[in-house]
Amino acid sequence: MDQKTIKAHKISDSEYKKILEILGREPNLLELGIFSSMWSEHCSYKSSKKYLNGFPTKAPWVIQGPGENAGVIDIGDGMAAVFKMESHNHPSYIEPFQGAATGVGGILRDIFTMGARVEVNMNSLRFGDVIGDSKVNRYQRYLVKGVVGGIAHYGNCMGIPTIGGETTFDSSFNGNILVNAFALGIVKSDEIFYGKAEGAGNPVIYVGSKTGRDGLGGAVMASDSFNEENKSLRPTVQVGDPFAEKLLMEACLELFKKGYIIGIQDMGAAGLTSSSFEMAGRSGSGMIMHLDKVPMRENEMTPYELMLSESQERMLICAKKGCEEKVKEIFAKWDLDAEVIGEVTNSGNMELFWYGKKVADVPIAPLSEAAPILDRPVKKPAYLDKIASGNLCGCGVSKISNKEAFDKIFAEPEILNKNFIYDQYDANIGTNTIKKPGFLGAAAIRVKENGVNLCMAMDCNSRMNYINPRIGAALAVAASGRKVAMSGAVPLAITDCLNYGNPQNEEVMWQFAQGCEGIKAACKALNTPVVSGNVSLYNETDGVSIQPTPAIVMVGTAKNALLPSHFTKNGVNVYLIGDTKGVFAGSLYMKVVENRITGTLPEIDFIKERALWDLVIEANKCEILEFANSVGVGGVAITLAKMACIEQIGGNFDMIVDDDRDIFDESFSRAIVGVKNETEFLKLAKKSGLKFTKLGASGGETFKINEISVKIKQLAEIYFNKFSQIIKGETF
């Protein structure tokens, strides 16, 4: 095998030597392509697995943790929630509409392949600078429109509600946006299916759309960094057909009720290669596949193309012997291809044939269960010492008034209502949505089968992760859990999408290692295990890595009514729970007012964090709260302002602070609550041991906090309209 071909497949010298040892010979081109895909960062987690192994993954309510298509938790009365988050960053930067659309399609398949009907779509998005008229600004606005359009197209056509998410902006994402897709489904606990292929002689059946040449090398592309040349890689981005996926989902859900199959796997990254190797690998089996029997969309396709294509809307099934025709009948009813292309063996090898000729023979375990694990060097980034020594705004650096600061921060795209985005999503289809986009806090659905309210919240502060990757990642867990708890639900488990830069950079690997330590510590302390997730590395363009972004989704349940996260009526007494400590490192104030990222972060007090959750959950059970919201980006002032805008209810608030600017501080573990019964609330609050302070009351036509006063109609006009104007290029 010539060096040019080996390098083109992103195989290192040491990896090629390992391939020779495994095979005892030179690989052919097809085998090299298989090794390249299965050992890619995207499929093998070779740089990250060392750190992921320490995550807490078990709890009495966890049915399935990491290692399957998605995680599963018990939500009571014989029902389970199946959920996962994944990235489609690289494809979405190259071709935003199709990249984002197929990201949605891929995560939906991960859910319904477990036997669950998908009920929820959410997304975590990061873009660069959208304000201004530079080439970069215009391109970022184009990416926003394309990504949102792709998400809306696929989710709406599938009939699955998109009910929440988060979207933020920073120049570190100018060359590498992030598109993380989350989905959740509901299934009976005893009707879950897994990705396995066992039982020698059982047939292997290809179902779904035909295979074309789209997406070739996608897994390898997602394991590489960007430069200007990568923008020409549109042919490697898959093209999705949500209507075909809708048919595939319904066909699979019908099939699951019949008892015809052993296991099923989505054909995602690396297509037929990953699905076949993963199914056989989990079961310790072998497999024979006849590639000439694969349904093809294009002429003269080769075994290499068929194994590595990432054409969408396809599944691989291991059926019970004798049930082949029954399986095919179901898919024919839904106008989908279903062809027996092979069978399970006991050989432990993947044997591939092309019109009767063996074209590949590869041991399965070294590719699926025993891929190389790298121990990359780590080094604390030099920039951390520099930013840790900088002056903070609390030291009197800022020269503008609090009103000027408020106006600047409130007009930031990160703060503004994202109705331009969520108005494109159907959030109500399925009639289960009870908290949808635009209403702050966690999203929520009703599970009709058992009456449980299921809450989901996303969070990650990339700036704080840049300042301290360990504390920043832990904060993402805590903050997502806090949002769920502020709805009155009990946080149960997380899924994650760990977005970092180039792992070949030892400073990036240090960030990643620290981030994993933070997640591990937070999940253990808060008793919220990790049940699924994804790692996205090589988020780098021209040598510039993104800010670390370990996006977290927390899922929780409540049997009682959920709390709103905004002002619902006049005359409600409003309290702040938690300590204000003057935390400005990584804050939006620091970015917007002072145009820098400086300082150090305090440790998170997980005991106080959990106490805050428990206080609000208990208060909601006792029906003594009117609303509750986590204090987030922009601090108390901005959080209150957003809560006021939703129903245009003003408020009069006085916050006693050590420094005037502390109304913008972003201290952890704080909440704002509206109290219906002060006597009972004060009893619970005192019992919790947490600090609590009365801020004032909701009501009126003016929003006032300390010296800041603005008409609520004026505030709402900015909040609901400015983001759309920015993305349309109407205002800068």
From Swiss-Prot:
<feature type="binding site">
    <location>
        <position position="536"/>
    </location>
    <ligand>
        <name>substrate</name>
    </ligand>
</feature>
<comment type="subunit">
    <text>Monomer. Part of the FGAM synthase complex composed of 1 PurL, 1 PurQ and 2 PurS subunits.</text>
</comment>
<comment type="pathway">
    <text>Purine metabolism; IMP biosynthesis via de novo pathway; 5-amino-1-(5-phospho-D-ribosyl)imidazole from N(2)-formyl-N(1)-(5-phospho-D-ribosyl)glycinamide: step 1/2.</text>
</comment>
<feature type="binding site">
    <location>
        <position position="86"/>
    </location>
    <ligand>
        <name>Mg(2+) 1</name>
    </ligand>
</feature>
<keyword id="KW-0658">Purine biosynthesis</keyword>
<feature type="active site">
    <location>
        <position position="42"/>
    </location>
</feature>
<feature type="binding site">
    <location>
        <position position="266"/>
    </location>
    <ligand>
        <name>Mg(2+) 2</name>
    </ligand>
</feature>
<keyword id="KW-0963">Cytoplasm</keyword>
<feature type="binding site">
    <location>
        <position position="533"/>
    </location>
    <ligand>
        <name>ATP</name>
    </ligand>
</feature>
<dbReference type="Pfam" id="PF00586">
    <property type="entry name" value="AIRS"/>
</dbReference>
<feature type="binding site">
    <location>
        <begin position="87"/>
        <end position="90"/>
    </location>
    <ligand>
        <name>substrate</name>
    </ligand>
</feature>
<dbReference type="GO" id="GO:0006189">
    <property type="term" value="P:'de novo' IMP biosynthetic process"/>
</dbReference>
<protein>
    <recommendedName>
        <fullName>Phosphoribosylformylglycinamidine synthase subunit PurL</fullName>
        <ecNumber>6.3.5.3</ecNumber>
    </recommendedName>
</protein>
<feature type="active site" description="Proton acceptor">
    <location>
        <position position="88"/>
    </location>
</feature>
<keyword id="KW-0460">Magnesium</keyword>
<feature type="binding site">
    <location>
        <position position="110"/>
    </location>
    <ligand>
        <name>Mg(2+) 2</name>
    </ligand>
</feature>
<dbReference type="GO" id="GO:0005737">
    <property type="term" value="C:cytoplasm"/>
</dbReference>
<feature type="binding site">
    <location>
        <position position="109"/>
    </location>
    <ligand>
        <name>substrate</name>
    </ligand>
</feature>
<dbReference type="InterPro" id="IPR041609">
    <property type="entry name" value="PurL_linker"/>
</dbReference>
<dbReference type="Pfam" id="PF18072">
    <property type="entry name" value="FGAR-AT_linker"/>
</dbReference>
<keyword id="KW-0436">Ligase</keyword>
<dbReference type="InterPro" id="IPR010074">
    <property type="entry name" value="PRibForGlyAmidine_synth_PurL"/>
</dbReference>
<comment type="function">
    <text>Part of the phosphoribosylformylglycinamidine synthase complex involved in the purines biosynthetic pathway. Catalyzes the ATP-dependent conversion of formylglycinamide ribonucleotide (FGAR) and glutamine to yield formylglycinamidine ribonucleotide (FGAM) and glutamate. The FGAM synthase complex is composed of three subunits. PurQ produces an ammonia molecule by converting glutamine to glutamate. PurL transfers the ammonia molecule to FGAR to form FGAM in an ATP-dependent manner.</text>
</comment>
<keyword id="KW-0067">ATP-binding</keyword>
<keyword id="KW-0479">Metal-binding</keyword>
<comment type="similarity">
    <text>Belongs to the FGAMS family.</text>
</comment>
<dbReference type="GO" id="GO:0004642">
    <property type="term" value="F:phosphoribosylformylglycinamidine synthase activity"/>
</dbReference>
<feature type="binding site">
    <location>
        <position position="496"/>
    </location>
    <ligand>
        <name>ATP</name>
    </ligand>
</feature>
<dbReference type="InterPro" id="IPR010918">
    <property type="entry name" value="PurM-like_C_dom"/>
</dbReference>
<feature type="binding site">
    <location>
        <position position="45"/>
    </location>
    <ligand>
        <name>ATP</name>
    </ligand>
</feature>
<feature type="binding site">
    <location>
        <begin position="310"/>
        <end position="312"/>
    </location>
    <ligand>
        <name>substrate</name>
    </ligand>
</feature>
<feature type="binding site">
    <location>
        <position position="238"/>
    </location>
    <ligand>
        <name>substrate</name>
    </ligand>
</feature>
<dbReference type="InterPro" id="IPR036921">
    <property type="entry name" value="PurM-like_N_sf"/>
</dbReference>
<dbReference type="GO" id="GO:0005524">
    <property type="term" value="F:ATP binding"/>
</dbReference>
<feature type="binding site">
    <location>
        <position position="84"/>
    </location>
    <ligand>
        <name>ATP</name>
    </ligand>
</feature>
<dbReference type="InterPro" id="IPR036676">
    <property type="entry name" value="PurM-like_C_sf"/>
</dbReference>
<keyword id="KW-0547">Nucleotide-binding</keyword>
<dbReference type="InterPro" id="IPR016188">
    <property type="entry name" value="PurM-like_N"/>
</dbReference>
<dbReference type="GO" id="GO:0000287">
    <property type="term" value="F:magnesium ion binding"/>
</dbReference>
<feature type="binding site">
    <location>
        <position position="534"/>
    </location>
    <ligand>
        <name>Mg(2+) 1</name>
    </ligand>
</feature>
<dbReference type="Pfam" id="PF02769">
    <property type="entry name" value="AIRS_C"/>
</dbReference>
